[in-house]
Amino acid sequence: MARRFLLEFEKPLVELENQIDQIRELARDSEVDVSQQLLQLETLAARRREEIFHALTPAQKIQVARHPQRPSTLDYIQMFCDDWVELHGDRNGTDDQALIGGLARIGEKSVLLIGQQKGRDTKENVARNFGMAKPGGYRKALRLMDHADRFNLPIISFIDTPGAYAGLIAEEQGQGEAIAVNLREMFRLTVPIIATVIGEGGSGGALGIGVADRLLMFEHSVYTVASPEACASILWRDAGKAPEAASALKITGPDLMKLGIVDEVLKEPSGGNNWAPLQAGDTLKNALEKHLSELLALSPDELRNNRYSKFRKMGKYLESQSIESEISV
């Protein structure tokens, strides 16, 4: 059994994990009944893991969202989608591997799936550009979404990116324009759109496939206008203040629910989705089927109008006059 990658704040679980592994090896190599001891240790480990993850800070949630063993877009597709057929290319000479898309069925419903895809190791991450799509990736996604609109297929997007690729080649190819066009065109689509933040939801890279009728996110996912490291570097010229930036940015599910940005926060298994990926897949499938059935009951005009209103209401501000009144009181 492959050893799990433990984050720094999970290190108190290392000793328990080692004891559990030793008892399992003993059970394999002998006829001694160790089921009771194994159950006690696993129960204790689960309880401690629950305590640790219940008290995570925003900065620690980012570590969970970036966990190398966290389920990816392709993992979820393999878990609960049937007849998956990947579609390639932006019809302009590129086929960005950081952003994938294709046709599949969820239950009895045919859908279009798009999402960022990270790698499991260095080689895969280089091939996938660490989930950071170039302009061709967003143009590919738009081509596929137009296809879905033409054939009346609901669109399901999986968001998992630190942000759109910011290299020179991306700027030369029109990164900002590609994302902006996606934002505009997604408001015009007449089919249901459901987006789920399965890991990181970073900046314009997430928004490029994130204009949706329903926005879901997992409990330990994050959705942010900029990475805390970038925010700290810009505001305080010190990337070491990323934990403070993470708290200020309001990047977690509960905060985003209060702000009216996220429609549902999906509970994760104890220890995060990487500890029980199949359970996470069941949770996501059930949520997608529920929201999809609700959205399919709406007309194309209702979908577009509601989508526009949802995003129009986002954001809060304070009038300077009311601030002055509060100070004088």
Swiss-Prot record:
GO terms for cellular component: acetyl-CoA carboxylase complex. It holds the Pfam family ACCA. Residues 40-294 form the CoA carboxyltransferase C-terminal domain. Its EC number is 2.1.3.15. The keyword Nucleotide-binding applies. Coiled coil: none annotated. Keywords: ATP-binding, Cytoplasm, Fatty acid biosynthesis, Fatty acid metabolism, Lipid biosynthesis, Lipid metabolism, Nucleotide-binding, Transferase. It is found in: Cytoplasm. Pathway: Lipid metabolism; malonyl-CoA biosynthesis; malonyl-CoA from acetyl-CoA: step 1/1. InterPro entries: Acetyl_CoA_COase_a_su, ClpP/crotonase-like_dom_sf, COA_CT_C. It comes from the Bacteria. It catalyses: N(6)-carboxybiotinyl-L-lysyl-[protein] + acetyl-CoA = N(6)-biotinyl-L-lysyl-[protein] + malonyl-CoA. GO terms for molecular function: acetyl-CoA carboxylase activity; ATP binding; carboxyl- or carbamoyltransferase activity. Belongs to the AccA family. Acetyl-CoA carboxylase is a heterohexamer composed of biotin carboxyl carrier protein (AccB), biotin carboxylase (AccC) and two subunits each of ACCase subunit alpha (AccA) and ACCase subunit beta (AccD). This is Acetyl-coenzyme A carboxylase carboxyl transferase subunit alpha. It comes from Prochlorococcus marinus (strain NATL1A).
